Every structure is written in structure tokens, then in C-alpha cells.
């Protein structure tokens, strides 16, 4: 009942509470590398990492049948911040990635070859707070935001996609006993999508907005060590 939309946009309210220890990681590969570091303080911690991959050195040594205008290149990074409070925990996560390449492939029907290019730029951010607000009562709140941009080039046909998505969620859970707990929550999905198509002879733009509000109630009932029941109901509009 808690997760709707066929789990296509799940905002998980359960993640790692705290890193185990401070650490620095360095990865070296033939086509790139990465670095990451985790720092801990009394009530806070911060983890960051980044990676970079490029096929340019590989293609300079090993030629293939494609004419690379821009060899495959990808860069990504993420950061996680955690803050402990007296009765709760706040987490903030953000990540980005960028992919870019362009090539001309051989084609028996096109003497000059078929040009294909792709650029992806994505940014994702979420935050979550979980804490105790009463006797056996806990509060979970979360929000996420995504920006995804894609540029595709096939010969003289150019397609540009832009998607902005937001997800807001709040859940209250009450533990009545070791055998019964009840969760009540609500969430909001907001999505905007735009696509532009163009070539020397034609151009068009289209898109959509999708807003969904959901409510759910879910219970966990333990009858014995071997038998338990999870039941719930969900409504969306």
C-alpha cells in the first residue's frame, strides 16, 4: 500500500543511518578512475565520491570501424550528508552524471555513414528526516527532485528531452505492541516532460505534466513466530 505507480518512483525512507568509519578510496582503471572520501564528526558525517571514464586513450591505440567525432566520456559524482539530532536523523543525498559521445557508423545504404550522438545530463537530490515524536510514534518525511536532460542526434535529426520530477512524502507509524503497528501516509508526485524534435525540414515540440496525489494506510500484524500479516489500502488521484 505504501508504494504506488508500480514502484516506478519509489522514495525510500530507509537508508544507511551512519557510515561505519572514515575512509578514502581511490580507483584506477585503464579508461578512467575515481576517488571517494568519508569524514565523521560527533553528530554529522559527509561522504563524497567522483569518477571519470573516457575511451579516448583506448581508441587512440585500438582503432575500430567507427569514426569517433567525440569518444565516449562519462563523469559522475555524489555526496551524502547525515546529521543526528536528539530524537531523529536527517539525511541529504545528491548525485549527478554526464555522458557524451558522437560517432559515424558505416552503413551500406549511406556512403558517408550514419552519424549518431548522445548527451545525458542528470541531477538527483533527496532528503529525509526520521524521528520519534511520541510514545511509540515515529515520523518519516522525505523529498526528492530529479532533472534529466537528453540530446540525441541521428543524422540531421535532433531530439532534446527534458524531464523535471519531484516527489514529496510523509509517513507516521504507531507501534501499539510487539504484535501490531500501523502506518499512515501521503505523497505527491510532480512530473513535467518536454521534447523538441528538429531537422532541416521539420520541427515540433510536445510534452506533458503529470501530477499524482496518494494516500495509504498499512498495518503489520504478528500472530506467531511463523505467521504474520501485512495489510493495507492505497488511494491515488
Enumerate the predicted regions with their spans.
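Repeated loop/turn-to-beta-strand initiation elements of outer-membrane beta-barrel proteins
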Residues: 43-46, 56, 87-90, 135-139, ...
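Residue-level signature of outer-membrane beta-barrel architecture
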Residues: 15, 39, 82-85, 131, ...
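Transmembrane beta-strands of outer-membrane beta-barrel pores
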Residues: 15-17, 30-32, 41-43, 52-56, ...
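Flexible loop and strand-edge segments within Gram-negative outer membrane beta-barrel domains
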Residues: 55-61, 66-76, 88-165, 200-207
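N-terminal periplasmic accessory domains that precede
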Residues: 1-24
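Membrane-embedded beta-strand positions of outer-membrane beta-barrel proteins
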Residues: 24-28, 48-50, 92-94, 141-143, ...
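Hydrophobic, lipid-facing positions within transmembrane beta-strands of outer-membrane proteins
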Residues: 9, 22, 31-35, 73-79, ...
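Signature of Gram-negative outer-membrane beta-barrel scaffolds
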Residues: 183-237
Amino acid at each position: 500500500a505504501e508504494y504506488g505507480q508500480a514502484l516506478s518512483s519509489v522514495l525510500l525512507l530507509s537508508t544507511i543511518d551512519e557510515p561505519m568509519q572514515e575512509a578514502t578510496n581511490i580507483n584506477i582503471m585503464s579508461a578512467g578512475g575515481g576517488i571517494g572520501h568519508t569524514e565523521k564528526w560527533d553528530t554529522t558525517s559527509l561522504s563524497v565520491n567522483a569518477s571519470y571514464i573516457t575511451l579516448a586513450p583506448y581508441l587512440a591505440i585500438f582503432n575500430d570501424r567507427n569514426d569517433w567525432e567525440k569518444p565516449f566520456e562519462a563523469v559522475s559524482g555524489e555526496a551524502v550528508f547525515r546529521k543526528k539530532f536528539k530524537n531523529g536523523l536527517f539525511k541529504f543525498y545528491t548525485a549527478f552524471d554526464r555522458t557524451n559521445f558522437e560517432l559515424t557508423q558505416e552503413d551500406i545504404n549511406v556512403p558517408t555513414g550514419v552519424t549518431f550522438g548522445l548527451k545525458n545530463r542528470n541531477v538527483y537530490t533527496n532528503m529525509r528526516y526520521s524521528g520519534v515524536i511520541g510514545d511509540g510514534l515515529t515520523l518519516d518525511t522525505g523529498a526528492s527532485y530529479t532533472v534529466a536532460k537528453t540530446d540525441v542526434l541521428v543524422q540531421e535529426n535532433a531530439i532534446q528531452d527534458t524531464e523535471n520530477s519531484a516527489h514529496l512524502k510523509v509517513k507516521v507509524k504507531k507501534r501499539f505492541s510487539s504484535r501490531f503497528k500501523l502506518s499512515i501516509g501521503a505523497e505527491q508526485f510532480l512530473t513535467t516532460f518536454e521534447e523538441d524534435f528538429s531537422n532541416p525540414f521539420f520541427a515540433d515540440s510536445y510534452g506533458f505534466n503529470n501530477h499524482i496525489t496518494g494516500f495509504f494506510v498499512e498495518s503489520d500484524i504478528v500472530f506467531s513466530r511463523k505467521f504474520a500479516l501485512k495489510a493495507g489500502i492505497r488511494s491515488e488521484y
